[in-house]
Each structure stands twice: as structure tokens, then as C-alpha cells.
Amino acid sequence: ASLAGKRVGIIQGTTQDMYAKAEWAPKSVTIVTYQNQDQVYQDLVNGRLDATFQDKTQAGYSFLKTERGKHFAFAGDDITDSRITGFGVAMGLRKGDAALKSRLNDAIAAIRANGTYQKIAAKYFDFDIYGAKQ
């Protein structure tokens, strides 16, 4: 379904904001920016917005799985335009700190191999946050 003529709420300065302004605004989508996500949810619930565009995990856990979000749902496919949204979430390290990078990579590999990662993730998420295909 087209978003043309719709009002979409977005947190200003985010990658979603950049994407929406580049891809949707030229197609007659009204982009409404906010300082924080609570303001977006308030306007969505009160009918001042048709949709919101944000991080899927945040939307699911901070809104859709709450009482005020129970009448809303995800729509459309995930947006994965690496030109704007990048390639996922990462950890920032000091450039050239190869030892720390190696220790972190080894620790992540170890907990994924021994099942610790899966146990922790299952406690908090209903999907694999590491990005493994289901």
C-alpha cells in the first residue's frame, strides 16, 4: 500500500528520518519529526499520524506489546537500504585496538557456541537479535 498522502511520525535526526525524507517525502508522504518516540506514539494513538517509522525492536517492545499499542501492528517489509540505514548495529572501538576487537569477537563466538547467547536472547527477545536466519 502506498503512503502517499499519509502522515508518518519519525524521530528527527535518525536514519529513519534521513530515509523517509529521501525516499518518501518526494512521493507525497508527509514526514512529521519529533524530539522523542513518546511524542510519536501519543500522536499515533490520538489519530494525528497514520504511521510511524522506527527501529523494529523498539517499536515491538516499547509500543506494540503494550496496552496502548495493542490496536497497532507492523506493516510492510523491513527496510534495509544500506545506502542510508547502514549494515546493522555495531560496537564502536578505538581504531587500531586489535587486541580488544579480538577478545570481543572471541567472547561472542564462545557464547554462541556454548548456548549462553541463545539462553540470554530467549529471555528478552522473540527473535534472534544476532540476525541469524530462522
Residue ranges and their predicted role:
Residues 1-134:
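Proline/Glycine/Serine-rich low-complexity intrinsically disordered segments
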